[in-house]
Amino acid sequence: MTGLRSDMITKGIDRAPHRSLLRAAGVKEEDFGKPFIAVCNSYIDIVPGHVHLQEFGKIVKEAIREAGGVPFEFNTIGVDDGIAMGHIGMRYSLPSREIIADSVETVVSAHWFDGMVCIPNCDKITPGMIMAAMRINIPTVFVSGGPMEAGRTSDGRKISLSSVFEGVGAYQSGKIDEKGLEELEQFGCPTCGSCSGMFTANSMNCLSEALGIAMPGNGTILATSPDRREFAKQSARQLMELIKSDIKPRDIVTEKAIDNAFALDMALGGSTNTILHTLAIANEAGVDYSLERINEVAARVPHLSKLAPASDVFIEDLHEAGGVSAVLNELSKKEGALHLDTLTVTGKTLGENIAGREVKDYEVIHPIDQPFSEQGGLAVLFGNLAPDGAIIKTGGVQDGITRHEGPAVVFDSQEEALDGIINRKVKAGDVVIIRYEGPKGGPGMPEMLAPTSQIVGMGLGPKVALITDGRFSGASRGLSIGHVSPEAAEGGPLAFVENGDHIVVDIEKRILNIEISDEEWEKRKANWPGFEPKVKTGYLARYSKLVTSANTGGIMKI
């Protein structure tokens, strides 16, 4: 093979020192002239979604060698959002996405690889690697580690990590005893893999199929299944074909491909975090994609599958029902729902990939003419409380609830809110405001899983709305509205809300408003003392200065 990118470090007299170093790293004489492939892994012992990825790296490298490439493996960092939840660790979660993107870009660009296999799985690792792939723009395929099996209680009921979080609230409100909580803890996470519901990790890994950067099966084949190992081999072999065809990420990730990703998101009722990450990916791909366009996708795409935490249906059930390809095939029956001509890493179009992939269980994936709702499972709200938008997972809201209005109960941090909820300062009908938790204010835009789980666990899920400039775990459900932009730390409207203010949430009309006179509003703005950064040293201080609000993906800009 000639004209390789890696020729930069392997060809010519002046590259003798480079070749000498490569020989020391194990490169043989016959390897020079073959494609050099970066195997970007994310194996880490403390993250259950990644503990098995060392094996995956070996499988991928062997498949690359067999297909005529020379693999070089390296690892990224990773943060487990569940373990980081509820303390300062969560402030590092979203910022870790930027570190991952920067580190992958650095390693691959410095060493002139010809192609890349990315092996992510959990929340920020997948989007971080995709962002890097858009920047580098060399042939790349994604192979996630696969979802965890659902847990099962002693009576056979399926559960997940969100069941454990909500179990804490149920225990504290006296709904279950300590033995009941212990059972949830013991069985909530039974295997390796990304947590078993339609949470952020599984949402992003499913969206990778619709986006076109991963082969069919990426989002739903279980981590423990032998099929996942075979999938890794096939994906590695396919990368070598992408190099021959010179198909690059930016050839695949276009505006229409992003429409398809959001269409799947709407059909599945995915995590709200997918919007944050996909907007960041669009930015790196050079695609100008607005929040308003997401509502346009939602308007034409029905909600076909309701998965945990919104139901007792899990990713393993979605896989058995036909997986992502079956969902997309069902969507394709509605004119205009998908762009079937978009290119994918298979070398075929999305339409060709999903042809004939029929639904096997219409209880799990509803027919196109019998959806859970005519509009998708995510929505963007606008109003005087969110001029630049806010996100709600409509698929996670209890059936029949489309509007909520009530008095604001204001907290200036997640910790303050959690304490207030536990101590019964929040009652039915209230609108909880948690502010100064955005990308800049948090810093790091921490997830609000603990407060939402506490609210649900106490039986207030359908009766209380929660609004924040922070974000939510994919395991969150209920009237949870996040990503409010501009954030409070930037002088956004949330900064001026006071206890007792009347807040209106109207999902059908896509409205998020505060009812207050212009005169009073201007008075509050004039008296706002400004925001004092919570962290003044280290990475989070730097991140806080450079990061944008959620409506642009929470990206870092100079």
Swiss-Prot record:
List of residues binding [2Fe-2S] cluster: C122, C195
Sequence positions that bind Mg(2+): D81, D123, K124, E447
Record-level GO cellular component terms: cytosol
Keywords for the protein's UniProt record, in alphabetical order: 2Fe-2S, Amino-acid biosynthesis, Branched-chain amino acid biosynthesis, Iron, Iron-sulfur, Lyase, Magnesium, Metal-binding
EC top class, as a word: lyase
Chain positions found as N6-carboxylysine: K124
InterPro entries named in the record: Dihydro-acid_dehy_C (IPR042096), DihydroxyA_deHydtase (IPR004404), DiOHA_6PGluconate_deHydtase_CS (IPR020558), ILV_EDD_C (IPR056740), ILV_EDD_N (IPR000581), IlvD/EDD_N (IPR037237)
Protein name, entry field: Dihydroxy-acid dehydratase
Originating organism: Bacillus licheniformis (strain ATCC 14580 / DSM 13 / JCM 2505 / CCUG 7422 / NBRC 12200 / NCIMB 9375 / NCTC 10341 / NRRL NRS-1264 / Gibson 46)
Lineage: Bacteria, Bacillati, Bacillota, Bacilli, Bacillales
